[in-house]
């Protein structure tokens, strides 16, 4: 069971069978007390702001807190679990008691990946890890290979997206216990599904973050982020806390990878950037498993994604490609507000570039910011780019949380879904997308008092004067905003739901049979734009064994099919000499036939 335990510098750690060391960096305090169950035990200052105490006879499930000189009791910032919310007692967890899971499971190759992004709280009516287990066979049968779980680190309240986490090592209690999350991951592995966790290392949430009280030096007042003072990554105890969190989740929970949120907001002046250090430590510590590390970075840069002579990725594996989404969204909806203005002019050409090259912005000036954005990315193979037409951000950050199907209609959405799943980029589906879910995914929280008021007013202000949504923005703290965001599983049994599922399943079967084998070559691919016109795109990718081509039309008029060589892998609806409105055709030409 060795891989189920990870020794942290912070927190409650078993140092022998029945002795637990409690250790916390509290440089802002002169003394500290451990409240263990009913007993208050003085901790020892061991230098450089650290306090610790070794206590015999501590058992799994024992509750504890740290007590400040003024009597304030706070949770352990490195808590493995909470007895309740972020303000209450932490719980001692003996990770040695967890079963080892599937010892044979070593993960899946990245080229196989079809990502399914889900939010535990809204994925099922119950909103728990255990309830989500019941849906795993459905995902495996559909053709999903990787589940990407939105952040589960404990955050304020019971409802939230998870990006306001404050206890990085503790699964959110409203979703279940550590045992429940272990069970979810083990069940997924038993079905051949990888599990990746979205992790937030760029800020802490506004409720339940006691680090400024324990250690003001954890933050840098000179380094501002959208969420307040930045994290002082250069400080050694801070660096230990941040770098060990990813290793903890991968080791103790046997996860298959991590998605690193908004890394453009992680500013580190160290000689070695903290993200590089994290990736190197992960690769060194877990050499025998398929570990996939993806990044979200609005800068469109690739310095953390080098490739060796064999095409392997010694640091991070891939990057979310917002440019693909934004171009596809403008192409399908015609919306040009906010960041969509960068894709407003000739969106068909921008989407064609996203398909063939990856980034749309590779050094060009953004209309929104007036600054150059991005770098050339021709050195990266197609599987470097994680593409999507929907995700939690792009849906939930709309005032009304509308999904693409509600904005562009079912037919256009089907065409774009087919292009997504049959392109050589790595596709990501957002929960419910596979059966044509129309329920919104809204921004929801569970704050109270002045914080709730500030969030409510801030959300309304954000959309005031924007498409007339200001007055009607749902209150994030209203429980109905959360309830409305839950997946409607009843739709799966409807005729429309069944039609969508057949469509998605067909596409994923084709992907696994025809696209994945091309990606396993691991080579840089030549992408080519064959033709574009308003509402129409035709592109191709030349692989060593042949050429993959696709053409689609979302316009109101039929257009001639461009000259696409090879056998038809997929067409919807039937495509012969012309591309009807809202249609797509995908072809593959072997070897010499593709030249």
Predicted regions and their residues:
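Conserved alpha/beta catalytic core and glycan-binding cleft of carbohydrate-active enzymes
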Residues: 275, 279-467
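Substrate-binding/active-site clefts of carbohydrate-active enzymes
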Residues: 83, 106-110, 119-292, 303-304, ...
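The feature marks proteins involved in alpha-glucan
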Residues: 1-21, 40-117, 124-127, 138, ...
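Core domains of carbohydrate- and sulfate-ester-processing enzymes
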Residues: 68-103, 191, 211-216, 220, ...
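Short proline/glycine-enriched turn/loop motifs at strand-loop junctions of beta-rich domains
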Residues: 25-31, 555-557, 564-565
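C-terminal beta-strand-rich structural cap/linker in extracellular carbohydrate-active enzymes
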Residues: 26, 60-63, 575-595
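Glycan-recognition and catalytic regions of carbohydrate-active enzymes
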Residues: 4, 8, 357-374, 429-430, ...
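Short edge beta-strand/loop segments characteristic of extracellular beta-sandwich folds
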Residues: 20-27, 550-552
């Amino acid at each position: 069971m060795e891989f189920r335990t990870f020794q942290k510098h912070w927190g409650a750690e078993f140092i022998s069978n029945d002795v637990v060391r409690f250790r916390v960096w509290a440089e802002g305090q002169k003394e500290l007390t451990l409240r263990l169950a009913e007993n208050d035990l003085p901790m020892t200052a061991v230098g450089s702001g650290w306090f610790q105490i070794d206590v015999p006879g501590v058992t799994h499930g024992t509750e504890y807190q740290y007590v400040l000189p003024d009597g304030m009791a706070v949770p352990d910032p490195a808590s493995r679990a909470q007895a309740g919310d972020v303000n209450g007692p932490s719980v001692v967890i003996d990770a040695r008691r967890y079963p080892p899971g599937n010892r044979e499971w070593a993960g899946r190759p990245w080229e196989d990946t079809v990502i399914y992004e889900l939010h535990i709280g809204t994925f099922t009516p119950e909103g728990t890890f255990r309830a989500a287990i019941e849906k795993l066979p459905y995902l495996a049968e559909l053709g999903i290979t990787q589940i990407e779980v939105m952040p589960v680190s404990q955050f304020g309240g019971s409802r939230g997206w998870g990006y306001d986490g404050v206890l990085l090592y503790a699964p959110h209690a409203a979703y279940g216990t550590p045992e429940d999350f272990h069970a979810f991951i083990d069940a997924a592995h038993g079905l051949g599904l990888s599990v990746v966790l979205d992790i937030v290392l760029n800020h802490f949430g506004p409720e339940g973050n006691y680090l400024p009280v324990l250690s003001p030096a954890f933050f840098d007042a000179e380094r501002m982020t959208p969420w307040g003072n930045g994290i002082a990554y250069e400080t050694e105890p801070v660096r230990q806390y941040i770098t060990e969190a990813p290793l903890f989740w991968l080791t103790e929970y046997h996860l298959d990878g991590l998605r690193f949120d908004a890394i453009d907001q992680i500013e580190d002046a160290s000689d070695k950037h903290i993200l590089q250090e994290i990736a190197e430590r992960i690769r060194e510590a877990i050499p025998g498993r398929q570990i996939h590390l993806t990044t979200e970075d609005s800068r469109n840069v690739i310095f953390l994604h080098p490739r060796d002579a064999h095409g392997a990725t010694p640091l991070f594996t891939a990057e979310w490609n917002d440019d693909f989404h934004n171009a596809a969204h403008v192409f399908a909806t015609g919306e040009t507000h906010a960041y969509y203005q960068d894709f407003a002019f000739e969106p068909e050409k921008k989407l064609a570039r996203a398909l063939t090259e990856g980034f749309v912005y590779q050094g060009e000036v953004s209309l929104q910011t007036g600054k150059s954005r991005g770098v050339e990315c021709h050195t990266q193979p197609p599987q470097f780019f994680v593409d999507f037409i929907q995700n939690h951000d792009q849906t939930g950050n709309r005032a009304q949380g509308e999904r693409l199907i509600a904005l562009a209609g079912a037919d256009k959405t089907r065409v774009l879904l087919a292009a997504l799943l049959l392109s050589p980029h790595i596709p990501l589906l957002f929960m419910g997308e596979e059966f044509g879910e129309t329920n919104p995914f809204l921004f929801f929280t569970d704050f109270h008092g002045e914080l709730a008021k500030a969030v409510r007013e801030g959300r309304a202000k954000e959309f005031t004067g924007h498409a007339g949504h200001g007055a009607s923005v749902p209150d994030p703290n209203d429980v109905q905003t959360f309830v409305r965001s839950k997946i409607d599983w009843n739709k799966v049994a409807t005729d429309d739901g069944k039609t969508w599922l057949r469509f998605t399943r067909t596409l994923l079967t084709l992907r696994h049979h025809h696209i994945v084998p091309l990606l396993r070559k691991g080579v840089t691919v030549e992408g080519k734009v064959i033709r574009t016109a308003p509402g129409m795109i035709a592109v191709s990718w030349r692989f060593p064994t042949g050429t993959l081509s696709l053409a689609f039309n979302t316009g109101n008029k039929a257009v001639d099919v461009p000259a696409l060589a090879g056998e038809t892998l997929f067409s919807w609806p039937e495509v012969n000499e012309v591309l009807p409105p809202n249609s797509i055709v995908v072809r593959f030409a072997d070897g010499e036939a593709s030249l």
